[in-house]
Curated annotation (Swiss-Prot):
This is 2,3-bisphosphoglycerate-dependent phosphoglycerate mutase. The lineage of its organism: Bacteria, Bacillati, Bacillota, Bacilli, Lactobacillales. One of its GO terms (molecular function) is phosphoglycerate mutase activity. SUPFAM superfamilies: Phosphoglycerate mutase-like. Substrate binds at residues 8-15, 21-22, 60, 87-90, 98, 114-115, 183-184. NCBIfam families: pgm_1, PRK14115.1, PRK14117.1.
C-alpha cells in the first residue's frame, strides 16, 4: 500500500487579503507558515515516510514543502520542482480583490470564472508585472505553452503529463510521494485520480490545511482517502 500526500500551500499573503493569486509568486503569511509546520508534525505523527517529493515553482508551495518535510524529519527527501504543478493561472483577475471583482463583473460571472470547469477568465496582458512571459523561471518554455489564463480543464491538461511521467510511476514503483502544490492544481489531479465528472469537481475544495492522503494498491487503484488529523 503506497501513500500520496497532497499538501496545499499554507495561507498566502494574498489569500489573507482575498486576492486572486494564480501564478503570482506570493509568500506565505505567518498563519500559512504555521500551517506548513503543523502539516509536517501531522505527517510525523502519522508515521508517513516519503521517498520523494514534488512541488511547483512558486515560493508558497516550495516553502510549504520544505517546512512539511523539515518538521516531519524528512528534509533530506529529494524534491523536484515543476511549473506543471503551479496554481491555475487566473489571467486578468490576478491581483484583483475577489469582492471588488464581483462588484465590477457581477457575482454570477465571477462565480462562473472561479468554479466552472471550462470557462476561461480574461487573459492577462503580456506586459503585466506578473506575466510569466518575462519571468526567468519559465525561460526554458516555449511561449506558446505559457498561459495567459486558465480554467480547471486547462490546468488539468497542464498537470496531467507530470502525473503520468513522474507521480504515477513513482507510486507504481512502491514509493510514498509528497506533493506540495495549490488548490486548483490539486483539484485537477483529484478529478483525474477519482474520475470525477466536470460537475462533481466544482464542489470539491482543497483547504490550506491539513494534508490530504490517498492510498493506492500496487495497480494504482485508490483504496483510501482521508485528511491527516481526522478532518
Amino acid at each position: 500500500m503506497v501513500k500520496l500526500v497532497f499538501a496545499r500551500h499554507g495561507e498566502s499573503e494574498w489569500n489573507k487579503a482575498n486576492l486572486f493569486t494564480g501564478w503570482a509568486d506570493v509568500d506565505l503569511s505567518e498563519k500559512g507558515t504555521q500551517q506548513a509546520i503543523d502539516a509536517g508534525k501531522l505527517i510525523k505523527e502519522a508515521g508517513i515516510a516519503f521517498d520523494l517529493a514534488f512541488t511547483s515553482v512558486l515560493k508558497r508551495a516550495i516553502k510549504t514543502t520544505n517546512l512539511a518535510l523539515e518538521y516531519s524529519d524528512q528534509l533530506w527527501v529529494p524534491v523536484e520542482k515543476s511549473w506543471r504543478l503551479n496554481e491555475r493561472h487566473y489571467g486578468g483577475l490576478t491581483g484583483k480583490n475577489k469582492a471588488e471583482a464581483a462588484e465590477q463583473f457581477g457575482d454570477e460571472q465571477v462565480h462562473i470564472w472561479r468554479r466552472s470547469y471550462d470557462v476561461l477568465p480574461p487573459d492577462m496582458a503580456k506586459d503585466d508585472e506578473h506575466s510569466a512571459h518575462t519571468d526567468r523561471r519559465y525561460a526554458h518554455l516555449d511561449h506558446s505553452v505559457i498561459p495567459d489564463a486558465e480554467n480547471l480543464k486547462v490546468t488539468l491538461e497542464r498537470a496531467l503529463p507530470f502525473w503520468e511521467d513522474k507521480i504515477a510511476p513513482a507510486l507504481v514503483d512502491g514509493k510514498n510521494v509528497f506533493v506540495g502544490a495549490h488548490g486548483n492544481s490539486i483539484r485537477a489531479l483529484v478529478k483525474h485520480i477519482k474520475q470525477l465528472s466536470d460537475d462533481e469537481i466544482m464542489n470539491v475544495e482543497i483547504p490550506n490545511f491539513p494534508p490530504l492522503v490517498f492510498e493506492f494498491d500496487d495497480k494504482l487503484n485508490l483504496t483510501a482517502e482521508y485528511y491527516l488529523g481526522g478532518e
